[in-house]
């Protein structure tokens, strides 16, 4: 998918880029695969902000995407490539041989009219989903399950992929796009290929309003807040933060502070961390 550049007719158009949607073949979504969703603006059931910088945005309908791919040995034909406002990747509309319709993440190279299949006996080609034990070493994969049957959780964003490096005992060794190498059960499923719409990272919003349409609110620096709002706040003019280390809004040291649980059970499944030289 290409990138469309705009002429600087206004300040908001200057440097603005957008997808040209050349891969999209159907503009209206499949009604049977839609669900409503409510926006909570980052609040929990008590009304407290649990995720900052969220709120507003355009109304959207959720597309029911199949991340499990458990309809085995039934071939499906790609009927359309569609836009999904809820994710960076495009989605593909499948129609199975028995008439059932489904959405999946659209991998790079998948086109209308192609056939895909899932199951242990499926061919090693783009869009097919198989258990890791049936995928050859060196294959590029995406939509990887962490728990068999739960559905894909890794490598789902636009342009991302992982590579199967090897198999050891009951585990597969997988290298993620972040550089992390981890073990995944061989009974977990993955889809062949790279997630499509890889040009997404080159898109420039151009103006703040376009970001607000996505439901993202401004991120304000702590140094320009009042001292009762942030540890960095207060002072006369541009004042230093007044602490030996940068702090979070809740008074915790934040620069380089590890937030992952040191006792997490999944630590033993990480062979190499995503940061060079760190485990």
Swiss-Prot record:
Function noted in UniProt: One of the primary rRNA binding proteins. Required for association of the 30S and 50S subunits to form the 70S ribosome, for tRNA binding and peptide bond formation. It has been suggested to have peptidyltransferase activity; this is somewhat controversial. Makes several contacts with the 16S rRNA in the 70S ribosome.
One MF annotation (Gene Ontology) recorded for this entry: transferase activity
Transmembrane regions listed in the UniProt entry: none
Region (Disordered) location: 1-43, 207-279
Keyword check for Nucleotide-binding: no
Record's protein name: Large ribosomal subunit protein uL2
Coiled-coil spans in chain: none
SUPFAM superfamilies noted in UniProt: Nucleic acid-binding proteins (SSF50249), Translation proteins SH3-like domain (SSF50104)
Gene3D superfamilies to which the protein is assigned, alphabetical: 2.30.30.30, Nucleic acid-binding proteins (2.40.50.140), Ribosomal protein L2, domain 3 (4.10.950.10)
GO cellular component terms given for this protein: large ribosomal subunit
Entries under SMART domains matching the protein: Ribosomal_L2, Ribosomal_L2_C
Biased composition (Basic and acidic residues): 23-33
The entry's keywords: Ribonucleoprotein, Ribosomal protein, RNA-binding, rRNA-binding
Biological processes, Gene Ontology terms: cytoplasmic translation
Family: Belongs to the universal ribosomal protein uL2 family.
Bias type Polar residues, positions: 8-22, 34-43
Quaternary assembly: Part of the 50S ribosomal subunit. Forms a bridge to the 30S subunit in the 70S ribosome.
Regions of compositional bias (Basic residues) in chain numbering: 209-219, 254-279
